[in-house]
C-alpha cells in the first residue's frame, strides 16, 4: 500500500536467456504479460508502469525489440533496465551484441532510450 505522497514505478521483469529456466519467458510472453499489466496498472493513482527487460545479457535481440515495441505503443510508460554495472558485465554484453558501439547503444538500437528511461547502476559509461 502506498502512503500519501508516495509513488511507485514497477514492471514485470523480462528475461529469455542466461537465467534459471523457471524465471525465463519468451519474447512474446514477455510482451503479452507486460501489455496486460500495463492495461491493469497504468494510470492507477501514484503507480506507474515500467517496461522492464532485466538487462541485455538476459534478453535476446528479439525480446529487446518487443520491449521497444511496447515502449512505442505506450510512450507514457517508463523503461527500466540495468546498464554498465561492472566491466565483466560490459564485456559479456558486448560479446552478445557485437554490432553495438557501446552498452548504451544496444538499448538505443531497440528504441528503449527516452525521457522516461531509468538505467540502474550506469557506473562505467563510455564517453561520446
PLM segments and residue spans:
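Short, intrinsically disordered, charge-balanced linker/junction segments flanking boundaries
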Residues: 126-128
Amino acid at each position: 500500500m502506498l502512503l500519501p505522497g508516495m509513488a511507485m514505478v514497477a514492471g514485470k521483469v523480462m528475461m529469455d536467456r542466461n537465467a534459471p529456466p523457471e524465471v525465463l519467458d519468451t519474447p512474446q510472453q514477455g510482451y503479452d504479460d507486460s501489455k496486460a499489466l500495463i492495461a491493469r496498472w497504468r494510470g492507477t493513482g501514484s503507480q506507474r508502469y515500467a517496461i522492464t527487460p532485466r538487462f541485455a545479457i538476459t534478453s535476446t535481440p528479439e525480446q529487446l525489440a518487443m520491449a521497444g515495441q511496447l515502449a512505442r505503443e505506450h510512450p507514457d510508460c517508463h523503461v527500466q533496465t540495468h546498464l554498465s554495472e561492472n566491466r565483466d558485465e560490459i564485456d559479456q554484453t558486448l560479446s552478445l551484441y557485437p554490432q553495438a558501439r557501446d552498452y548504451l547503444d544496444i538499448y538505443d538500437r531497440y528504441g528503449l532510450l527516452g525521457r522516461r528511461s531509468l538505467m540502474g547502476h550506469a557506473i562505467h559509461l563510455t564517453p561520446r
